[in-house]
Amino acid sequence: CIIAILKGKQRDWRQPVPADEEEADMLKLWIVGASGQIGSAINEVLDPLEMEVFNTDKEELDITDTDEVLNFGVINRPDVIINCAAVTDTDLCEKEPELAYRVNALGARNLSIVARKTGAKMVQISTDDVFDGIRHTPYTEFDDTNPKTVYGRSKRAGENYVKEFTHKHFILRSNWVYGNGNNFVNRVLHAADTKDELLIASDQFGSPTSAKDLARIILYLIKTNEYGTYHATCQGVCNRYEFAQEVLKLAGKRITLRPVVTSESDLSST
């Protein structure tokens, strides 16, 4: 499970929100990037009797278009904006940095401007890639960021825009999220059906995190005023090779796995 640190105190998201933090009226929730794995998970676990939901994807709304985003926000006036939209393919970000910054940074800026203008709370989904990853101990919310990739730098820029434009924000950094859609788990399962051998990085460490668990902590936080930056993952740590081993074991699939360094891995890190 995920344990959130709220103002220096541990609070279990499975416990009821204190009465003074509850919202009296139905929340109007705008989920941006709703068809992705986190957006889909939020829609699966939320209570439709508690929340009115607006779902948008790039087909309905271009978050890089400031006027389009402002018009949608002002017309619909959400209570909460959850930004799940992002370019997460690290290789694509390196090849097309302009695209990465437009979506991951400017998109977050535009949504946070709407949040400030309408008084909405803003949830920004971020990543552990805002750190350099060279440390052998876990990073905290108070550590300095130092991204080494275009993806990480663009996501940090998005965080900074959110902090600049609205104080009513929740920035959630997570990693190794799995759920519906294109992710490491599903790529391992696909490889097991199409290959005899798979090379997996054993020098990358993280905490595999259920998209549904992450969705639940988001839905918990938006009912509070505990604004700030959070590291939100499931408990436990492993490397990519160990993660793939467990995925195949649980799925009952057989394929030869070989531990390698990241540069030799068959699968991208996203």
Question: Where in this protein do the model-derived segments appear?
Answer:
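N-terminal Rossmann NAD(P)H-binding glycine-rich loop of SDR-like oxidoreductase domains
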Residues: 29-45
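Adenosine-cofactor binding site in Rossmann-like domains, unifying the SAM/SAH pocket
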Residues: 53-69
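NAD(P)H-binding glycine-rich loop region in Rossmannoid oxidoreductase-like domains
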Residues: 66-103
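Active-site "gating" loop of Rossmann-like NAD(P)-dependent oxidoreductase/epimerase domains
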Residues: 87-90, 95, 128-149
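NAD(P)-cofactor binding segment of oxidoreductase domains
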Residues: 95-123
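Active-site helix of classical SDR
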Residues: 154
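NAD(P)-dependent short-chain dehydrogenase/reductase
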Residues: 160-208, 213, 219-220
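Mid/C-terminal beta-alpha module of Rossmann-like enzyme folds, strongest
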Residues: 217, 224-268
